[in-house]
Design a protein with these regions (language model features):
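Carboxylate- and glycine-rich phosphate/diphosphate-binding segment that chelates Mg2+/Mn2+
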Residues: 1-44, 132, 138
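Catalytic-loop motifs flanking and including active-site residues across diverse enzymes
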Residues: 2, 6, 48, 66-70
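Short acidic alpha-helix initiation/capping motifs at coil-to-helix transition points
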Residues: 4-5, 46-47, 91-100, 117-123
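Short alpha-helical scaffolding segments that buttress acidic/His motifs in well-ordered protein cores
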Residues: 30-38, 71, 117-122, 143-144
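Glycine-rich phosphate/pyrophosphate-binding beta-alpha loops
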Residues: 35-67, 125-127
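Gly/Pro-rich interdomain helix-loop hinge
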Residues: 58-113
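Short, amphipathic C-terminal "tail helix"
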Residues: 113-148
Length: 148
C-alpha cells in the first residue's frame, strides 16, 4: 500500500518537479512520495538493487544515482517478466531514462571494477535474500559490466 501510494505520487509529480523547479506543490508531493517509500522499505526491506548499489556508493556514487542506474538492469536480469511482476515497471524505467542522471565515469567508476563490485555486493546477504530471485555473483558482475 505504501509503495503504491509513493509510486502514484511519483508518476504524477516527478515530471512537474523536474520541469517546474519552483513548483512548491510538486516538491511537497515528492516529499510525501519519499516518505511513503521509506515506510514501505521499513516494512518490506530492500532487495538486490540496493545490494548492488552499496558497491557503487562505496565508490562515491550517490545513493539515488546508484539505485536509478541499477533498477532496470537488476530487475530485467533477475525476473522473468518484470513488466508483469512490478506495477508500472515500463513507465518507471522510461521516467528514469528521462532523468538527468550522471554516468558512472563522472565518479571514476570503470568497467574493470565490475568484478570487485559484484564480489562486494555478495556480502549484502540480507538484501539479496530478500530479492524474489537468486542473484549469483556472475550475474551481478554482468549487470555492473553492462552499466558502461
Amino acid at each position: 500500500i505504501w509503495s503504491m501510494a509513493g509510486i502514484e505520487l511519483i508518476r504524477e509529480w516527478l515530471p512537474k518537479t523536474i520541469h517546474e523547479r519552483d513548483n512548491d506543490e510538486a516538491r511537497q508531493q515528492m516529499l510525501f512520495a519519499s516518505f511513503f517509500g521509506g515506510v514501505a522499505l521499513a516494512h518490506a526491506g530492500t532487495t538486490a538493487v540496493h545490494a548492488l548499489a552499496y558497491s557503487l556508493g562505496k565508490r562515491g556514487v550517490p545513493h539515488g544515482v546508484a539505485n536509478s542506474l541499477l533498477f532496470e538492469p537488476v530487475m530485467r536480469a533477475t525476473l522473468k517478466a518484470p513488466e508483469e511482476q512490478i506495477p508500472y515497471f515500463s513507465e518507471l524505467c522510461t521516467m528514469i531514462h528521462r532523468l538527468p542522471i550522471p554516468t558512472l565515469d563522472r565518479y571514476d567508476v570503470c568497467r574493470k571494477d565490475a568484478a570487485a563490485m559484484a564480489a562486494e555486493a555478495m556480502g549484502q546477504t540480507r538484501l539479496l535474500q530478500n530479492h524474489p530471485a537468486e542473484v549469483p555473483e556472475k550475474m551481478a558482475r554482468g549487470i555492473f559490466e553492462n552499466l558502461f
